[in-house]
A protein has these predicted regions:
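Short acidic-hydrophobic catalytic motif
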Residues: 216-221
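ABC transporter nucleotide-binding domains
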Residues: 4, 11-205, 211
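Residue-level recognition of well-ordered beta-strand positions that form the cores
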Residues: 7, 25, 230-232
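Short, charged/small-residue-rich alpha-helical element at the C-terminal edge
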Residues: 224-269
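Short amphipathic beta-strand starts and helix->beta connectors
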Residues: 211-214, 225
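Flanking scaffold residues of small Cys/His-coordinated metal-binding clusters
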Residues: 1
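Residues at or immediately preceding the N-termini of alpha-helices
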Residues: 105, 215, 248-251
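Hydrophobic side chains in well-ordered alpha-helices
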Residues: 71, 214, 253-255
Length: 269
């Protein structure tokens, strides 16, 4: 059974087509990878699922029915742009946001205490958020996202800013949430993260779904003629891309074409 579906969703902003007839099916109790480069349309789709914005056309179905305002109480959303109040005390803010999600004060305090102890941040309960490191702030944001135990969890680039140890720890927490029965949408531009934890995948590029299906099946289907490129981004960082070579084109001609689009640092099959 699919817990979430979008059907032919279209969204346009000031003449820019952000989503073009996007359809996805998210099976219940799975981790669904929403993969694509920055600007592909992933965040727009997430905002529509969250009812932050409405589609111009198309349908969103939530747990078997057309999406309604009440459904947002069963969604936990961790946006890529974190939005906590820097000047507010950590515990005070966490309780306030948990209560907005429908928890009583005693229940909010109890659940938050368990999570803070689990992430080793209880000593920071009475400190202002701005006093925490970026990694600690993101742990707080993650806890607030999951605290009301929603049926659907949406994580947009959740590992951004984490060192490898804490990123791996967060992956384990996400897998535990799946084991507890939650349905999870995991949005990223990093294919390796998708392969590690996702069951299903949809690849969005230039506002359209260009590939979807079970991760293992997709990997086998596109294993041949697939190359890994490390390229330098405009911001100066390095990004890993996996690109399938077109048929009937030599490697040298293909690399020449890619070199006109990217600053290629390495190239492996």
């Amino acid at each position: 059974m699919n817990f979430l579906e979008t059907e032919n969703v279209v969204k346009q902003y000031a003449g820019h087509l952000a989503l073009n007839k996007v359809s996805i099916q998210v099976p219940q109790g799975t981790i669904f990878g929403l993969l694509g480069p920055n600007g592909a349309g992933k965040t727009t789709l997430i905002r529509i699922i969250n009812r932050i914005t409405a589609p111009d056309s198309g349908i969103v179905r939530f747990n078997g029915h057309e999406s309604s305002p009440e459904d947002i109480y069963q969604i936990g959303y961790l946006p890529e742009e974190r939005g906590l109040y820097k000047k507010m005390k950590v515990g005070e803010q966490a309780i306030y946001l948990a209560q907005l999600k429908g928890l009583s004060y005693p229940e909010a305090r109890s659940r938050l205490t368990r999570w803070f102890e689990k992430f080793d941040i209880m000593p920071w309960w009475n400190r202002k958020l701005e006093e925490l490191s970026k990694g600690m702030q993101q742990k707080v944001q993650f806890i607030i996202t999951v605290i009301h135990e929603p049926e659907l969890l949406i994580f947009d680039e959740p590992f951004s800013g984490f060192d490898p140890v804490n990123a791996d720890r967060l992956k384990q927490e996400i897998l535990e949430l799946k084991a507890a029965g939650h349905t999870i949408i995991f949005s990223t531009h990093n294919m390796s993260s998708v392969e590690e934890i996702c069951d299903e995948i949809a690849l969005i590029n230039r506002s359209e779904v260009v590939l979807s299906g079970n991760v293992k099946e997709v990997r086998e289907r596109f294993k041949s003629n697939t190359y890994i490129l490390n390229v330098r981004k405009e911001t100066g960082g390095i990004e890993e891309l996996r690109i399938r070579k077109e048929e009937n084109i030599s490697n040298s001609d293909w690399l020449t074409r890619l070199a006109s689009q990217y600053e290629i640092l390495s190239f492996t099959e």
